[in-house]
Swiss-Prot record:
It catalyses: isopentenyl diphosphate + 2 oxidized [2Fe-2S]-[ferredoxin] + H2O = (2E)-4-hydroxy-3-methylbut-2-enyl diphosphate + 2 reduced [2Fe-2S]-[ferredoxin] + 2 H(+); dimethylallyl diphosphate + 2 oxidized [2Fe-2S]-[ferredoxin] + H2O = (2E)-4-hydroxy-3-methylbut-2-enyl diphosphate + 2 reduced [2Fe-2S]-[ferredoxin] + 2 H(+). It comes from Aliivibrio salmonicida (strain LFI1238). HAMAP family: IspH (MF_00191). The keyword Iron applies. It comes from the Bacteria. Binds 1 [4Fe-4S] cluster per subunit. InterPro entries: LytB/IspH (IPR003451). Pathway: Isoprenoid biosynthesis; dimethylallyl diphosphate biosynthesis; dimethylallyl diphosphate from (2E)-4-hydroxy-3-methylbutenyl diphosphate: step 1/1; Isoprenoid biosynthesis; isopentenyl diphosphate biosynthesis via DXP pathway; isopentenyl diphosphate from 1-deoxy-D-xylulose 5-phosphate: step 6/6. This is 4-hydroxy-3-methylbut-2-enyl diphosphate reductase.
């Protein structure tokens, strides 16, 4: 049984930056370091940071006074930022710069009282943070997930409307929703460039290229990872039986029985170390050669905050 590796896969620049922020904060300021929400949606990563002294909380009320808190890669609402400022907490912001770009689009629309439609999944922390950028009482912000949601959407002024999207969605599904928005609201405006992040796009393109070449697809990622779920869904949509797993122990031998080729890819928050562990488990179940496909080269890099670039605390 041949193992085919997707390329690109795994960590993106935003995830790399977020994890580095937590690691450097622990190195410079020592444990405990509080992190609001999982810094990235990967159990392997989160457990590793916990062992080094990171404490993950869901609300700032769980952070004691005079402590450091890190905002996760998914971003936070303006209300959370205000609360942290009022409590004089030391904040390091690990929000992905591509999420921040969407936040800025919403904030600009809010200042002009332009209504905003967000394409995204209800309850996802990125969606909650993005919705929390809108402050205009004269306008409004609305969440849609499907073309059917658009059909039911009622806005105040169809001629003064803007849309943005969650960065980790399926490219195809988002395109369907945008098409419906433009049909129902012909004058709606959108971002100059698609909000779907480069890494989400590239990993989905890699799955498209690989799905027809393999008999079964293993996606490495956590169940709460939006972009990992979209990879599994896309592969299934393309006709390849696919599974999302968080660790080698979740891989089942029967999935691979009588299969000639197994594809392996990873969501943007899954580390290569975990991918390698799962490849080794595939080999235990009969995997032989590993063939890595060619893919789009990624050179994106995001700096950590200046305060964390120094080697010692003055």
């Amino acid at each position: 049984m041949k193992i085919v590796l997707a390329n690109p896969r795994g960590f993106c620049a935003g995830v790399d930056r977020a994890i580095s922020i937590v690691e450097r904060a622990l190195e410079l300021y020592k444990a405990p370091i509080y992190v609001r929400h999982e810094v990235v949606h990967n159990r392997f990563v989160v457990e590793g940071l916990k062992q080094r002294g990171a404490i993950f909380v869901e609300e700032l009320s769980e952070v004691p006074d005079d402590n450091i808190v890190i905002f996760s890669a998914h971003g936070v609402s303006q209300a959370v930022r205000t609360e942290a400022k009022e409590r004089a907490l030391t904040v390091f912001d690990a929000t992905c710069p591509l999420v921040t770009k969407v936040h800025m689009e919403v904030a600009r629309a809010s200042k002009k009282s332009i209504e905003v439609v967000l394409i995204g999944h209800a309850g996802h922390p990125e969606v909650e943070g993005t919705m929390g950028q809108y402050a205009s009482e004269a306008g409004g912000m609305y969440l849609v997930e499907t073309p059917e949601d658009v059909e039911k959407l009622i806005v105040q002024d169809p001629n003064n409307l803007h849309y943005v999207s969650q960065t980790t969605l399926s490219v195809d599904e988002t395109a369907d929703v945008i098409d419906e928005l433009r049909r129902v609201f012909p004058k709606i405006q959108g971002p100059r460039k698609d909000d779907i992040c480069y890494a989400t796009q590239n990993r989905q393109d890699a799955v498209r290229d690989m799905a027809g070449q393999v008999d079964v697809m293993i996606v490495v990622g956590s169940k709460n990872s939006s972009n990992s779920n979209r990879l599994r869904e896309l592969s299934e949509k393309l006709g390849t039986t696919s599974y999302l797993i968080d660790c080698p122990e979740e891989l089942k031998e029967e999935w691979l029985t009588n299969q000639a080729k197994v594809g392996v890819t990873a969501g943007a928050s899954a580390p290569e170390e975990l991918v390698n562990q799962i490849i080794e488990q595939v080999k235990v179940f009969g995997g032989t050669t590993v063939d890595e496909l060619k893919g789009r080269e990624e050179n994106m890099f995001f700096e950590v905050p200046k305060e964390l670039q120094i080697k010692t605390v003055s």
